Amino acid sequence: MSARKKSAAPKKPVWDPSIVVFACNWCSYAGADTAGVSRIQHQPHFRMIRVMCSGRIQPGFVLRAFEKGADGVLVSGCHLGDCHYQFGNEKAIEQFDKTKSVVKMLGLEEGRLRLEWISAAEGARFARIIDEFIEQLRALGPSPLFADKVPAAAPGEEPEEAIARV
């Protein structure tokens, strides 16, 4: 058999994790927009749900995203001290800690849930966080909970509506 006729082993397709991003309207969502307007390259394997404040993100929202097939969830808000609603991001920390304990009880790895502060001017930071989170989830593999994938949220859709729709 000649060298030309040797067939290469078929390449295994790369698995792309599904991420749900809950983003504060005033900072994190604007940071994602800055990344897009600036044409900063990042991986596209996430669905954005815009909320008015990161303090509004209840554990049930995150758990529903996992239930509907998300491999990871990113909660993002204004930097501490820069919250449009003054103390919303402090409330987000409290909610995040509650959510983290429930996720742990479900047997999911802590690395599937992430909290980040991203300002409107930090488009490059948003892109870097998305890329890092996707690589972290690739190392963990698919979520052991459910196989369904989460669709995108419609513009102006409330978080409850976006999650209930899936």
Regions from the PLM with identified roles:
Residues 1-166:
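Iron-sulfur-associated redox domains of electron-transfer enzymes in respiratory
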